[in-house]
Amino acid sequence: MSVANSRTAVYPGTFDPITNGHIDLVNRAAPLFERVVVGVAYSPSKGPALPLERRVELAQEALAAHANVEVRGFDTLLAHFVRDMGAGVLLRGLRAVSDFEYEFQMASMNRHLIPEVETLFLTPAEQYSFISSSLVREIARLGGDVSGFVPASVVDALRQVRESRAQV
């Protein structure tokens, strides 16, 4: 089957929160495609620290320098979102070998659901290979400094979450 539109890529994730690793991947993908759509998944089952709207805002702020990058929230099956965006490429990041098994399984499932779309894996720059949103959330929740892992706007957002939970 032919590729839908190989000039448009979707980079999906929960982005709870967006990290410097995510930003690095978009920075490297943006020159490769005419259009990159960062799809921020609703994912209520993951119990996100930040609401979908706030995660979209933070990603938009972090990626504003790219004219060909847009950020959109979605609450549908990823395959439907990719088709709705007219994308021919699904971007995924691989931080370590430990990510591979899960990502391979997801790529195989997506190949069945959207056979016209290719999954492309990018590895992070070495200085970002250990960063994950879950680690950033945990460090922030415990009052640690996450400024080396996320943009300043995300540091502020996580601090607000921590302070609001402390008042409860």
UniProtKB/Swiss-Prot annotation:
Superkingdom of the source species: Bacteria
Gene Ontology CC terms, in alphabetical order: cytoplasm
Disulfide bonds: none
Protein's cellular compartments: Cytoplasm
Binding site for ATP: 14-15, 22, 93-95, 103, 128-134
Main location: cytoplasm
The protein's required cofactors: Mg(2+)
BP terms from Gene Ontology: coenzyme A biosynthetic process
A GO MF label: ATP binding
Catalytic activity field: (R)-4'-phosphopantetheine + ATP + H(+) = 3'-dephospho-CoA + diphosphate
Known EC number: 2.7.7.3
Keyword Nucleotide-binding in record: yes
CDD domains: PPAT
TM segment ranges: none
Binding site for substrate: 14, 46, 78, 92
HAMAP family registered for this protein in UniProt: PPAT_bact (MF_00151)
Family: Belongs to the bacterial CoaD family.
Function of the protein: Reversibly transfers an adenylyl group from ATP to 4'-phosphopantetheine, yielding dephospho-CoA (dPCoA) and pyrophosphate.
Protein name: Phosphopantetheine adenylyltransferase
Organism: Xanthomonas campestris pv. campestris (strain ATCC 33913 / DSM 3586 / NCPPB 528 / LMG 568 / P 25)
